[in-house]
Amino acid sequence: MVINQKNLSSPVAPYDKSGSQSSTKADIPSINYTVDHSFQKRETSGKELSEATPQVTQSLSNQLILTTLNDLYNWARLSSLWPLLYGTSCCFIEFASLLGSRFDFDRFGLVPRSSPRQADLIITAGTVTMKMAPSLVRLYEQMPEPKYVIAMGACTITGGMFSTDSYSTVRGVDKLIPVDVYLPGCPPKPEAIIDAVIKLRKKVAQEDFVERNNFRQIHRYYSISHEFKSSSTVHTGKYLQSSERKSPPKELSEATGIPIQFILKNTQKTEIQP
């Protein structure tokens, strides 16, 4: 498009007595527009085309970040793991000390949440009982995908000292929910919790966005079931209603020389006057 401008240096129209600018048709500068529709085709050789292509220089590479959507997605998730506050025993005391300024686990992007709807990491700190097992499974199912589990402490992993003869302890939380990182100890130190979080971050960084459903753990009930042996009841409660339980034995009265049975009978018959 070619624009020809003429008479642009003409004087400005004078003002009248009222202050408005008086203008006539002859005073307005005329502008003529002529459009050139002819396109010239030129042949570009291979040498000229290579010179026109921008080259990646050192200054340009320092200003650009080249990555994939998969790496960006994993980086965003591993930098903002929000754990659910779930503690059932003494291991949670060590996890609570991690919240302080000495260890400062906020530098890893961990924000503790009290709602499973807003958390993507649950750290089972402490012993899991059979009455607590349905609640734990419900909390895990309410967490949005993708979600991760860290089993903290010996009682959570194998039952700990309650694994031998306890009737109410779950022998391993992996019977209920899938576990990503096992953290042994009784209880583990806050430094060990940080190391477990770092290992979980490395696992998240290696995941694939497209094939993440293929690596989901579905075998939850992996460990062996409880093996109990039935035996006769030791205490039935009937011994509390026996006559020997209500009255002291004869040997006690003979040893002390005091007729205890006679005194107890008299005290039961006497009435306290108001």
Swiss-Prot record:
It catalyses: a plastoquinone + NADH + (n+1) H(+)(in) = a plastoquinol + NAD(+) + n H(+)(out); a plastoquinone + NADPH + (n+1) H(+)(in) = a plastoquinol + NADP(+) + n H(+)(out). Disulfide bonds: none annotated. It is a peripheral membrane protein. Keywords: 4Fe-4S, Chloroplast, Iron, Iron-sulfur, Membrane, Metal-binding, NAD, NADP, Plastid, Plastoquinone, Quinone, Thylakoid, Translocase, Transport. Its EC number is 7.1.1.-. Belongs to the complex I 20 kDa subunit family. This is NAD(P)H-quinone oxidoreductase subunit K, chloroplastic. The lineage of its organism: Eukaryota, Viridiplantae, Streptophyta, Chlorokybophyceae, Chlorokybales.
